[in-house]
Structure formats: C-alpha cells, structure tokens
Amino acid sequence: MLKQVEIFTDGSCLGNPGPGGYGAIMRYRQHEKTFSAGYRLTTNNRMELMAAIVALEALKEHCEVVLSTDSQYVRQGITQWIHNWKKRGWKTAEKKPVKNVDLWQRLDAALGQHKIKWEWVKGHAGHPENERCDELARAAASHPTQDDIGYQPES
C-alpha cells in the first residue's frame, strides 16, 4: 500500500516580476516538513510551480499524494493543459512556446509514479496550511538568496 502524503503549497512575488519565494508543507501521519526559498527576480507563477516541484522531488518513494494549491495556473496546467503541450512539443494551441517550460518539464518529471490528487483551495481564506505556506513564501521573498536561472523576462 502506498504511503498517503499531504502537500500544501504557495508562491509569492513582491512585484510580478520581482523578488519571489515559495513555501510548502509536506505531511505524512504526524511528521511534517517545510520547504521555502527566495529568488531575487522571478514571477508568482514560477514560485507556485517551484513549491509543488520541491515538495514532490523530496518524496523518496512512490506515494499517494493530495496536493493542495491556491494556484489555478498550476492545477489547470497539470490536470488539463500539460498533455496537449507535450503532444505539441511544449507549444500552446497558438503554437507559441509554453511559458515556464523549464518548470513544467521539471514538475512533469517529479510526478514520477506517484498517484496525485490536485486540490484547489481559495487563497487568503483562512485555510490554515495555505496561510502557513503563504507566510513561508512571503518571508522567503523578503530575503531572496537565489537567482531564478530559468526566468525569462517578457519581451
């Protein structure tokens, strides 16, 4: 039987683009681990993706995961859009390159053999874990230590 893990994620950006951060909480039974990091220049969507990626990459074995995010971009991207993006060689229906393709590919790889249920939670609505992730993300964004290598400013 697969381990049942809960993951909660959030991303934050002080300006968009601007300094950003992500926060994630992973829970297995009574054990909890938090993740966060801040980047000097990035976007909110990239930080939302990073939160999910980092938490999923931390799983050491195949798990059954409920991943809660307040990002419709992440949830819809992974449940509705990614299949066609991959079929089209990471292009949108308009034949344009998928934005944040580096992170979508990394998230796709991080899914591995996990059984994942993607849940959307309303942000800033009192959901305790989402509020904690938001605090982690905002604190990390306030003290960025890393460069977001894949960030490409819009031209």
Curated annotation (Swiss-Prot):
GO cellular component terms given for this protein: cytoplasm
EC number from the UniProt entry: 3.1.26.4
Oligomeric form and interacting partners: Monomer.
One GO BP: DNA replication, removal of RNA primer
Protein name per Swiss-Prot or TrEMBL: Ribonuclease H
Entry-linked CDD domains: RNase_HI_prokaryote_like (cd09278)
Binding site for Mg(2+) 1: D10, E48, D70
Cofactor binding summary note: Binds 1 Mg(2+) ion per subunit. May bind a second metal ion at a regulatory site, or after substrate binding.
Cofactor(s) needed for function: Mg(2+)
Subcellular location as annotated: Cytoplasm
Highest taxon of the lineage: Bacteria
GO MF term (any one): nucleic acid binding
Reactions this protein catalyses: Endonucleolytic cleavage to 5'-phosphomonoester
Annotated source species: Klebsiella pneumoniae (strain 342)
List of residues binding Mg(2+) 2: D10, D134
